[in-house]
């Protein structure tokens, strides 16, 4: 799966989970600062990403995922 494919899927999931417009979801978007996620939203988002990509995101890794690109990079590293 290419970075573009991963980003597209992550973007859709983020938009749905955080109830934001897909156009607002950019690689550099911070889940909390730009997209208004609180800590519960972030946990739910991680769970949705785990399910969608059939991966496990450990708590330590989840804490380091602050932006959309962070999520894409982590997923790409697991898919490699």
Swiss-Prot record:
Keywords: Cytoplasm, Fatty acid biosynthesis, Fatty acid metabolism, Lipid biosynthesis, Lipid metabolism, Phosphopantetheine, Phosphoprotein. Residues 4-79 form the Carrier domain. Gene3D superfamilies: ACP-like. One of its GO terms (molecular function) is phosphopantetheine binding. It holds the Pfam family PP-binding. Pathway: Lipid metabolism; fatty acid biosynthesis. GO terms for biological process: lipid A biosynthetic process. It comes from the Bacteria. One of its GO terms (cellular component) is cytosol. 4'-phosphopantetheine is transferred from CoA to a specific serine of apo-ACP by AcpS. This modification is essential for activity because fatty acids are bound in thioester linkage to the sulfhydryl of the prosthetic group. The modification O-(pantetheine 4'-phosphoryl)serine is found at residue 39. It is found in: Cytoplasm. Carrier of the growing fatty acid chain in fatty acid biosynthesis. Belongs to the acyl carrier protein (ACP) family. PANTHER family: ACYL CARRIER PROTEIN, CARRIER DOMAIN-CONTAINING PROTEIN. This is Acyl carrier protein. It comes from Synechococcus elongatus (strain ATCC 33912 / PCC 7942 / FACHB-805).
């Amino acid at each position: 799966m290419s970075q573009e494919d991963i980003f597209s899927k992550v973007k859709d999931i983020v938009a749905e989970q955080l109830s934001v417009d897909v156009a607002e979801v950019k690689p550099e978007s911070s889940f909390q600062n730009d997209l208004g996620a609180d800590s519960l939203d972030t946990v739910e988002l991680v769970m949705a990403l785990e399910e969608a990509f059939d991966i496990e995101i450990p708590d330590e890794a989840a804490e380091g995922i602050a932006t959309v690109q962070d999520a894409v990079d982590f997923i790409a590293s697991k898919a490699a």
